[in-house]
């Protein structure tokens, strides 16, 4: 059960990331996008939050823990099958926001250290190497605004503004540290809250209300990445976020395609103790 669910989620992300790598290799998007070629040995730096480190519910930790079943691990396997060796360094932290990425003070970086400084140090050490970097941020900055089946519009505006201010700091630091043979890829976000549509009329209203929030989040991220010539993987598209055609679910009857995709690909429609579970985690700081 666990392997099936985690594999299903991770494979979707892997497919999108692989496409993005192919695009950078063919189109040479930006000075920092060298692409990867068959036979290469590439350093792979995985920056981000819960999904970046493969957080999944397990029998011992039903609410989730880091695993080796995330998209980064499967991207390594996918690359190996095409003749590219990725040496993976996962430095992400469950619940990481853009603030804690910069300042630390999270469950993973409790001293003066932080994920951003570790990422910069890694890139500087491997400045002359072929390097792939995936950046998976933003969700934990806004998830606090989507609580108790309510969209807090004031909170959304505040957090989007903070995200727009912090992202340039992060992306500038990363791009300045990269060498000429580095490929950076941003990771967009799916909408786990669509799953609320299977739990009653009030929750269905919430599911629709937060669609604009996730769309705005992806827009903010894409704009920020574009300023640094970093392509963004369209995760929302791969999760068929805008597909509303009704299909039959063996569990929930007729439901929209986008809701069915979330239920099949995440733990959001799973009963306790393993769900509902956002993955990424809802824990965040400011």
Please name every model-derived segment.
Residues 2-30:
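Secretory targeting and sorting signals
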Residues 28, 53, 97, 193, ...:
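Flexible, glycine-rich phosphate/dinucleotide-binding loops
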Residues 32-95, 133:
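Serine-esterase "nucleophile elbow" of acetyl-processing enzymes
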Residues 55-69, 97-110, 154-158:
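Acidic/histidine-rich helix-loop elements
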Residues 64, 68, 210, 277-285:
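Aromatic-acidic/polar surface patches that form glycan- and anion
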Residues 90-98, 238-241:
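Acidic helix-start/capping segments at beta-turn-to-alpha-helix junctions
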Residues 110-275, 282:
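Alpha-helical cap/lid subdomain in secreted, periplasmic
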């Amino acid at each position: 059960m666990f392997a099936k669910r985690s594999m299903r989620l991770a494979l979707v992300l892997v497919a999108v990331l692989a496409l993005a790598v192919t695009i950078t290799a063919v189109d040479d998007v930006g000075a920092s996008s060298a692409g990867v070629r068959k036979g290469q040995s590439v350093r792979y730096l995985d920056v981000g939050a819960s999904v970046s480190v493969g957080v999944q519910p397990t029998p011992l930790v039903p609410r989730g823990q880091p695993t080796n079943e995330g998209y980064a691990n499967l991207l390594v396997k996918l690359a190996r099958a095409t003749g590219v060796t990725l040496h993976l360094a996962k430095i992400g932290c469950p619940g990481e926001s853009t603030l804690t990425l910069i300042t630390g003070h999270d469950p993973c970086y409790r001293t003066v250290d932080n994920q951003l400084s570790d990422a910069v140090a890694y890139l500087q050490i491997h400045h002359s190497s072929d390097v792939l970097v995936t950046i998976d941020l933003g969700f934990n900055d806004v998830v606090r605004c989507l609580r108790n089946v309510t969209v807090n519009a004031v909170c959304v505006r505040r957090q989007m503004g903070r995200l727009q201010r912090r992202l340039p700091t992060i992306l500038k630091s990363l791009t300045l540290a990269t060498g000429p043979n580095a490929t950076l890829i941003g990771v967009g976000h799916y909408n786990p809250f669509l799953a609320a549509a299977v739990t009653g009329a009030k929750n269905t209203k919430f599911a629709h209300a937060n669609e604009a929030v996730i769309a705005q989040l992806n827009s903010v991220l894409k704009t920020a990445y574009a300023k640094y010539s970093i392509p963004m993987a369209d995760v929302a598209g791969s999760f068929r976020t805008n597909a509303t055609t009704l299909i039959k679910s063996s569990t929930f009857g007729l439901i929209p395609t986008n809701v069915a995709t979330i239920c099949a690909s995440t733990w959001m429609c799973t009963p306790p103790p393993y769900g509902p579970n956002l993955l990424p985690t809802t824990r965040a700081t400011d």
